[in-house]
Curated annotation (Swiss-Prot):
One of its GO terms (molecular function) is ATP binding. It comes from Streptococcus pyogenes serotype M5 (strain Manfredo). HAMAP family: DltA. Belongs to the ATP-dependent AMP-binding enzyme family. DltA subfamily. This is D-alanine--D-alanyl carrier protein ligase. The lineage of its organism: Bacteria, Bacillati, Bacillota, Bacilli, Lactobacillales. GO terms for biological process: lipoteichoic acid biosynthetic process. It is an enzyme of class 6 (ligase). The keyword Kinase does not apply. GO terms for cellular component: cytoplasm.
Amino acid sequence: MIKDMIDSIEQFAQTQADFPVYDCLGERRTYGQLKRDSDSIAAFIDSLALLAKSPVLVFGAQTYDMLATFVALTKSGHAYIPVDVHSAPERILAIIEIAKPSLIIAIEEFPLTIEGISLVSLSEIESAKLAEMPYERTHSVKGDDNYYIIFTSGTTGQPKGVQISHDNLLSFTNWMIEDAAFDVPKQPQMLAQPPYSFDLSVMYWAPTLALGGTLFALPKELVADFKQLFTTIAQLPVGIWTSTPSFADMAMLSDDFCQAKMPALTHFYFDGEELTVSTARKLFERFPSAKIINAYGPTEATVALSAIEITREMVDNYTRLPIGYPKPDSPTYIIDEDGKELASGEQGEIIVTGPAVSKGYLNNPEKTAEAFFTFKGQPAYHTGDIGSLTEDNILLYGGRLDFQIKYAGYRIELEDVSQQLNQSPMVASAVAVPRYNKEHKVQNLLAYIVVKDGVKERFDRELELTKAIKASVKDHMMSYMMPSKFLYRDSLPLTPNGKIDIKTLINEVNNR
């Protein structure tokens, strides 16, 4: 059991200073280097005299300097807000407006000019590292202090900043490194694929740093090259694969992704979206000896609240795979619409309680009050997911209560997509709906569009109109939120309350 994340890193800097903590295609950084670099960066950050415990936005990709900066900020007492290099400018602005960071650290070139907030460039971080300044930790992040803040999709088009404390992180990390389902070895060799702005990344970096392992990262140029990406992954000595099931499905398009070509790969950790029977079955065919662990949980409960090893028997007998045994320190309940606890086998909303539950959304008391509450004297969170518990305390997933979905590993609120589409000067009304496959997994996003008067006449074909609408909103939307198909209508169905009847459109798309 670890009691402090930085203490663990510092310990390995003493006992295995030359062991690699980070490897990007053979370019390695050691635990000794991570300590020296993070100490120097922390000293530099202290010299800026920022407001104590104020959050700092860090912009970049899957690089070592991002990791070193995160560690430095933790040492200097600041929560970090990871923002991926591929984020839309409008989203970055929204995050800045909500979070009010005291500083922006741009590991990659920052796409915006922000008044009133200082910006530190990569060259300044490099200069700080070269200074090799010693650092004495007197005010590092601890206890209920925010460790990181990750922004997720919001129902009003505004992202929500989930605050995860040091205590929250310890609850998750200690469970993961001690739980028999994960079976994390000492010095784990982990693939670092999900971006730091996606909390699934915590599932690889937290246990790796806690156990003195190595993170194998991929440069962003390689990630964009599908063929080269999976050829390269097959050559990495990774023992543990952490990703969404969708990314594994992509990997299985490559013949090199198999046990014969990747004998070191023994564990698969999945979270972020539903693991289907077909994906698990294909993985067992490719990696007959591998362990497949299915984890479940919202960002607000610190990455995951349950996990289970998927067996071949489960693949043969379940139509939807179980999502795990709840964490011992995080009692999980099923409640009805009145908040009453339901018995085993009864379906209702999944709620999670205990020390992994976030304190709420940053600077958003209204949304915090809606989602976070107290249950049986413990901090609790409404997941909005439908589920049930078996008599053996295995959690089963039954879908979403609302219109929030998981697609390609990302959590997306349909209203968020609709709001972004409605910003197009050509659109009068728009709504996004998911199309599901037979395994209840989101196959793609579609958009129903009513265009403004005179717009259709400007285009010879609907394809050209679709391209024009996409171009008009691409600077406001994350690419994974863009619907793959646009359906044009003269009007959209309404509920008796005068709202767009999304349920009817979902049923229409899915032939219900």
